[in-house]
Design a protein with these regions (language model features):
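Short, low-complexity N-terminal intrinsically disordered segments enriched in polar/charged residues
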Residues: 1-33, 37
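A broad structural signal for short, well-ordered beta-strand segments within beta-sheet-rich domains
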Residues: 6, 61-63, 68-70, 98, ...
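A solvent-exposed, acidic/Ser-Thr-rich amphipathic alpha-helical stretch
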Residues: 24, 28-77, 81
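Short beta-strand segments enriched in hydrophobic/aromatic residues
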Residues: 31, 87-91, 128-131
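A generic structural motif
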Residues: 38, 90-94, 115
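Short, cysteine-centered beta-strand-loop-beta hairpins and adjacent loop/turn segments enriched
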Residues: 60-62, 89-105, 133-139
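A short hydrophobic beta-strand element
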Residues: 77-94, 106-108
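Short beta-strand edge/turn micro-motifs at domain boundaries
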Residues: 82-84, 102-141
Length: 141
C-alpha cells in the first residue's frame, strides 16, 4: 500500500536533496536498480546513468528551489504505483562569459512509477518529465 502522505513525504525529500545538491549516494536508496529516467534532454537508466545526469546538472544550476504542488497516486497495482507529480522549480544558470546569471522558473509536470524494494522502502522505477510550463520572465532551457 502507498498512501498520499507517504508519497508526498517521499517526493518532498527527493526535491530537498536536489535543492541542496546532496551527495549522489543520497539518491541510491530512492531509485530501483533498473530505474529509467526520461528528461527533456536525455533518457538514462540505472544508478550510473542517473549519476552521470546528476553530476552534469549540479554543475549547471544553482540557487535551486523545488516546491511540490501535486503528488497524486493515479494507478494502484497493489505492489506498484503511478503518480502524477507537479513541481515548481526555480534555479539560476550562469553561462560563461555572461556578466550575470539568468533565472529559470517553471512548473515541471512528471509521471513517477514507484514500487517497494526488498526491504519495503519506496523507490522510483520510472521517472518521466512530461512537460514544462515556464513562468513569465523565465529563461528557457
Amino acid at each position: 500500500m502507498l498512501s498520499h502522505p507517504e508519497l508526498w513525504a517521499f517526493a518532498t525529500h527527493w526535491y530537498r536533496l536536489l535543492d541542496v545538491h546532496a551527495p549522489l549516494e543520497s539518491f541510491r536508496p530512492l531509485l530501483s536498480e533498473d530505474v529509467q529516467l526520461v528528461f527533456p534532454e536525455s533518457t538514462v537508466t540505472g544508478f550510473e546513468g542517473y549519476g552521470d545526469w546528476y553530476n552534469r546538472v549540479v554543475a549547471i544550476f544553482f540557487d535551486e528551489q523545488h516546491t511540490l504542488k501535486v503528488a497524486d497516486i493515479t494507478s494502484d497495482n497493489g505492489d506498484s504505483w503511478s503518480a502524477h507529480v507537479v513541481v515548481n522549480w526555480k534555479a539560476s544558470i550562469w553561462n560563461p562569459p555572461a556578466s550575470s546569471s539568468t533565472r529559470l522558473m517553471m512548473d515541471a509536470d512528471q509521471t513517477w512509477d514507484l514500487k517497494r524494494d526488498s526491504s519495503g522502502a519506496l523507490v522510483v522505477s520510472r521517472y518521466v518529465v512530461n512537460g514544462m510550463t515556464y513562468e513569465p520572465g523565465s529563461c528557457k532551457l
